[in-house]
Amino acid sequence: MKFINLVLCCFFFIIFFLSKPSLHASPPQPSINPRLFNAFIALQAWKHVITSDPRNFTKDWYGYNVCNYTGVYCAPAPDNPNITTVAGIDLNHANISGYLPEDLGLLTDLAVFHINSNRFLGTIPKSFSKLRVLYELDVSNNLLCGKFPSVVLSLPSLKFLDIRYNQLEGNVPSRLWDRKLDALFINNNNFQFAWPKNLGKSPVSALVMANIKVTGCIPSSIANMSKSLNEIILMNASLSGCLPQELGLLKNVRVFDVSFNNLVGELPETIGGMKKLEHINVAHNKLSGEIPASICSLPKLENFTYSYNYFCSEPNICLKLKDKDDKKNCIPHRPSQRSVNEYAYIDFDYVVLLRD
């Protein structure tokens, strides 16, 4: 009898043990849609290659509810409003160190990707080519390196591209200017390229190419951008030659900065046709001749900086501007001009200096 009781006891113990869930069993599948599950995989892979997060932006990046992650924004999918998906990532000014993994290509519904002012290394993954609805891409002020990220040329919905303040180098593909971008910022990199022949095809409103090397003269085809262009920043871009007369056709430009270059010749009088111009800076070039009165007569002009050139005359109307800088030129009877020992011959096309 004792033996039978022992057998029954062991039998029921085994049944009870087998009926309990194993501690080593696979976890149940999450009750989320496949797109959010892919987002979970992508974001966990990204978190795995983040080496420093001093402001704890990714501290709450755990669990399947990715819509509650800091910096992650969800919305109805563009192709199916009944499905929630990750539509945006904003980690601006987080000071995060790490890399961008290929797994980010799983975020196929991503429309906005902002990670400016961090310390991300490496390159933009080729898997970004899967982000067919990506509208804004801002990876500025990081430590990205290598050649121009050509993967951005394959993004059909991209309108805003900001890759400035990185360590990118080499040529900028001419195909970039065929893209229908609203804004383009490629400044403060190590790019070196010639002005593209198809520049005028670009519909950008902001053309910012400061602190890079662009060889040659500004092409006259820039006039073809007159409908969209309202800001031109070409400071310290290794520009040479003369400014084209066609600049006067840019009726919507408000800011024009070509300072710290090697431009020569006269300022085109046609700039007086840029009726919406508010700020113009041509300082630190080798421009000469007379300042056109048409520029100083612009109705919305607030600031005109033409210091450190070789202008020899300025009309009285320029003296009436509230905010102007004409120092270090060759203008008679004006203060803080160049000494006679700094120049010997000034022509409309070139300047010969006697001393540095």
Question: Model-predicted segments: where are they?
Answer:
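The feature encodes a structural signal of leucine-rich repeats
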Residues: 100-105, 124-126, 145-150, 169-174, ...
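LRR N-terminal entry segment and analogous cap-like coil->beta motifs
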Residues: 77-127
